[in-house]
């Protein structure tokens, strides 16, 4: 029996990060977490590119551009969609999650979903580095593991 697990050694990996400007306060905290996770596992700062987009809805297009490039081993999408009083939240969350998943499947590269979908700002703050950890950090570690697993298979 063969068992494959992606290692958490990131030296030499090149990572693209996409961050939504909408709810930038949250996106910036998620970015800080992702950068911390990548650096702690050995990614050099010069091997990380950050692209800012207007909001979560624009992420799949840039994720596809990055994932199709041989320059990147993994892509991380970060942002926050916070529920309001209309159905807009439902449409954005659904399309962004599908779009990001499709990019990963189409390109064969890990594209991590670090877009918080919360009912209120408090939940977003909790997941961006306070009570509930930092989803950006978690996505960075996941990206490292998946990039290495893909290389192993």
Curated annotation (Swiss-Prot):
Active site, renumbered: 88
InterPro entries: LS, LS/RS, LS/RS_sf
Record-annotated disulphide pairs: none
One function term, GO molecular function aspect: 6,7-dimethyl-8-ribityllumazine synthase activity
List of residues binding 5-amino-6-(D-ribitylamino)uracil: 22, 56-58, 80-82, 113
Binding residues annotated for (2S)-2-hydroxy-3-oxobutyl phosphate, in chain numbering: 85-86, 127
The EC number(s) this enzyme carries: 2.5.1.78
Catalytic activity as recorded in UniProt: (2S)-2-hydroxy-3-oxobutyl phosphate + 5-amino-6-(D-ribitylamino)uracil = 6,7-dimethyl-8-(1-D-ribityl)lumazine + phosphate + 2 H2O + H(+)
Pfam families listed in its UniProt record: DMRL_synthase
Pathway: Cofactor biosynthesis; riboflavin biosynthesis; riboflavin from 2-hydroxy-3-oxobutyl phosphate and 5-amino-6-(D-ribitylamino)uracil: step 1/2
GO cellular component terms, semicolon-separated: cytosol; riboflavin synthase complex
Family to which this protein belongs: Belongs to the DMRL synthase family.
PANTHER family: 6,7-DIMETHYL-8-RIBITYLLUMAZINE SYNTHASE (PTHR21058:SF0), 6,7-DIMETHYL-8-RIBITYLLUMAZINE SYNTHASE DMRL SYNTHASE LUMAZINE SYNTHASE (PTHR21058)
Name of the featured protein: 6,7-dimethyl-8-ribityllumazine synthase
Natural source organism: Clostridium botulinum (strain Alaska E43 / Type E3)
């Amino acid at each position: 029996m063969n068992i494959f697990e992606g290692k958490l050694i990131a030296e030499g990996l090149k990572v693209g990060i996409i961050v939504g400007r909408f709810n930038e306060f949250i996106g910036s905290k998620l970015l800080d977490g992702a950068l911390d996770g990548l650096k702690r596992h050995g990614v050099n700062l010069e091997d990380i590119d950050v692209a800012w987009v207007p909001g979560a809805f624009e992420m799949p297009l840039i994720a596809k551009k990055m994932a199709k490039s041989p320059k990147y081993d993994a892509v991380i999408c970060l942002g926050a969609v916070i529920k309001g009083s209309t159905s807009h939240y439902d449409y954005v969350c659904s399309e962004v999650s599908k779009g990001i998943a499709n990019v990963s499947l189409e390109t064969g590269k890990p594209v991590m979903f670090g877009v918080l979908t919360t009912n209120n700002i408090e939940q977003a703050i909790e997941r961006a580095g306070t009570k509930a950890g930092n989803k950006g950090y978690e996505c960075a570690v996941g990206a490292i593991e998946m990039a290495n697993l893909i290389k192993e298979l």
